[in-house]
């Protein structure tokens, strides 16, 4: 098992990665001070039948353990489920010494984390990710729910007590979820570990290579990229925005196509390609966009739909959290491993997006 130490201004904790990491969950809970009074596990209908009982059995403790299960899918990261989780917590007599365990992918981590951040003004929680995508969202303390007008618009910064990354849980993932999570791995490599980027190009020829020791290697390299950035900027006042590389267009695509119709990672992959496409123009550099495009397509990432309204996408990009005074701010790449947040005029984005759409385009429906 590998341990990755996360240090922020508000909290220090460890990410436990490996085939036996779940066996440490009881010790993690027992070592908490003040002692944990009871435990609420929040999961979804896709994960709970597969892994909920395994986690309950792993918790060799005397305290009451109960679960709250929501439907699966990004659209379930809603105020309705957030409110229902609070109702369940109150009915089961959670208190300020209770613990919430987030068992699932990024959607569950965000929802459960925000419940923990807000219940009685904040209680402890532990992340138990079950997807590759969650290697990003489980670390760093950003928790949120969606609003009909935008993704992750209602939330908080609330660091977990620990992250338990039990890699056998990932083996039940469908292919599209491996691909979705791998996009965030690529993102971390491109913005913060060029050596990892070259390793991925050499060692991960297909998504089937994301298994066993290679998976653990990837997690132990990608997670520290985020950890180092979060250590510098916990509440996204500066460099933490670099982690949004590919997300400005990616989130707009998720919103426009409808949550669940495109995975987060697929949206981010298209967004990263667009960011590289635009970066070449803004910085007058060669970032090997064509080569990068072919590399992404090899893994099955989608092309940019040609029939989506560029005007609508630009409007959605202006609702992005990085936007300021109605101006789009995007994370662009000067060179591999060096990115910056750049203010881009609407017209520039519009022209570039039309050209990118023409280059990449397929029909979305």
Curated annotation (Swiss-Prot):
HAMAP family listed in its UniProt record: DHQ_synthase
Swiss-Prot/TrEMBL keywords: Amino-acid biosynthesis, Aromatic amino acid biosynthesis, Cobalt, Cytoplasm, Lyase, Metal-binding, NAD, Nucleotide-binding, Zinc
Name the UniProt record assigns to this protein: 3-dehydroquinate synthase
Binding site for NAD(+): 72-77, 130-131, 142, 151
NCBIfam families: aroB
GO MF annotation terms: 3-dehydroquinate synthase activity; metal ion binding; nucleotide binding
Pfam families associated with the record: DHQ_synthase, DHQS_C
EC number: 4.2.3.4
GO CC term, one of those recorded: cytoplasm
Class of enzymatic activity (EC top level): lyase
Superkingdom, taxonomy of origin: Bacteria
Pathway where it operates: Metabolic intermediate biosynthesis; chorismate biosynthesis; chorismate from D-erythrose 4-phosphate and phosphoenolpyruvate: step 2/7
Catalysis: reaction(s): 7-phospho-2-dehydro-3-deoxy-D-arabino-heptonate = 3-dehydroquinate + phosphate
Gene: aroB
Family: Belongs to the sugar phosphate cyclases superfamily. Dehydroquinate synthase family.
Protein role: Catalyzes the conversion of 3-deoxy-D-arabino-heptulosonate 7-phosphate (DAHP) to dehydroquinate (DHQ).
Cofactor(s) the record lists: Co(2+); Zn(2+); NAD(+)
Record text on cofactor binding: Binds 1 divalent metal cation per subunit. Can use either Co(2+) or Zn(2+).
Protein localization: Cytoplasm
Residues reported to bind Zn(2+): 184, 247, 264
Principal subcellular localization: cytoplasm
GO biological process: amino acid biosynthetic process; aromatic amino acid family biosynthetic process; chorismate biosynthetic process
Family matches, as CDD domains: DHQS
């Amino acid at each position: 098992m590998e341990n990755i130490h996360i240090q922020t201004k508000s909290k220090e904790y460890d990410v436990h990665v490996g085939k036996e990491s779940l066996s440490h969950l009881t010790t993690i809970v027992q070592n908490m001070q003040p002692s944990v009074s009871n435990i609420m596990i929040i999961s979804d209908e896709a994960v709970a039948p597969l892994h909920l009982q395994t986690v309950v059995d792993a918790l060799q403790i005397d305290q009451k353990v109960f679960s709250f299960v929501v439907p699966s899918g990004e659209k379930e990261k809603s105020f309705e489920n957030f409110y229902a989780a609070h109702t369940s917590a109150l009915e089961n007599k959670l208190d300020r010494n209770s613990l919430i365990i987030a068992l699932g992918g990024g959607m569950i981590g965000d929802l459960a984390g925000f419940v923990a951040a807000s219940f009685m003004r904040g209680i402890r929680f532990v992340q138990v990710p079950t997807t590759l995508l969650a290697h990003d969202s489980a670390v760093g303390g950003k928790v949120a729910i969606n609003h009909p007008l935008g993704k992750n618009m209602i939330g908080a910064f609330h660091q977990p007590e620990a992250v338990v990354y039990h890699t056998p849980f990932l083996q039940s993932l469908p292919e599209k979820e491996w691909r979705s999570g791998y996009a965030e791995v690529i993102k971390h490599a491109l913005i913060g570990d060029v050596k990892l980027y070259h390793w991925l190009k050499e060692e991960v020829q297909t998504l089937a290579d994301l298994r066993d020791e290679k998976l653990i290697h990837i997690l132990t390299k990608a997670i520290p990229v985020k950890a180092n950035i979060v250590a510098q900027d916990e509440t996204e006042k500066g460099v933490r925005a670099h982690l949004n590389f590919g997300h400005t267009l990616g989130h707009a695509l998720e919103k426009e196509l409808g949550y669940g119709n495109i995975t987060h990672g697929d949206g981010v992959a298209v967004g990263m390609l667009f960011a590289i496409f635009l970066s070449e123009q803004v910085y007058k550099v060669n970032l090997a966009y064509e080569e990068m495009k072919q590399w992404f397509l090899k893994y099955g990432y989608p092309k940019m739909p040609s029939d989506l309204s560029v005007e609508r996408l630009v409007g959605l990009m202006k609702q992005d959290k990085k936007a300021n005074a109605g101006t789009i701010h995007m994370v662009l790449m000067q060179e591999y491993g060096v990115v910056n947040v750049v203010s881009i005029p609407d017209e520039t984005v519009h022209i570039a997006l039309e050209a990118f759409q023409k280059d990449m385009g397929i029909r979305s429906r």
